[in-house]
């Protein structure tokens, strides 16, 4: 990765805290190799979801029982996405954060919701602190309790977490401590 010197002939290595610019052959891209791979996974899932096949094989994470592989009709996924968008009153064109693994249905449903609601989807590699590299809070996000808990520990992440208008928390139980910390948050 190469830091940028703004055409001054010098390279500055400490003036940019964002994602690095990386060269791969004749191509330059922004972000880490892991982030680039996650973006590829998201694009591949979008392509798979939009193909002519009526159903999709999905994997549950096991948060509510044993992990399972299921065949799901795409139209059922669309109806579920429509119901969620309607219930949470998420306007078309809003920003959404994808920070859940795409190998599980929860991450895949964020992509489906973005397609159904014409949402601007920002994909961030799943991690314990998915807000760490963001500058602005998305309108809508789905996170695990652990991601929310860890985000509360960083002042930057906590500030963004408070600004997310619609936050789904799933994939595990919410501890009484986490519930208490979130009680005064303005999120829906």
Identify the role of each PLM range.
Residues 1-37, 136:
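Structural core segment of the AMP-binding/adenylate-forming
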Residues 2-16, 84-85, 104-117:
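Hydrophobic alpha-helical segments in the ANL/AMP-binding
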Residues 41-58, 92-93:
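Conserved pre-ATP/AMP-binding loop-to-beta segment of ANL
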Residues 54-82, 89:
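Conserved AMP-binding A3 loop
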Residues 55, 93, 135-138, 161-164:
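A general structural motif
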Residues 73-79, 95-150:
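AMP-binding/adenylate-forming
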Residues 86-91, 157-160:
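Glycine-rich helix-loop-beta junction characteristic of Rossmann-like nucleotide cofactor-binding loops
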Residues 155-188:
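Gly/Ser/Thr-rich phosphate-binding loop
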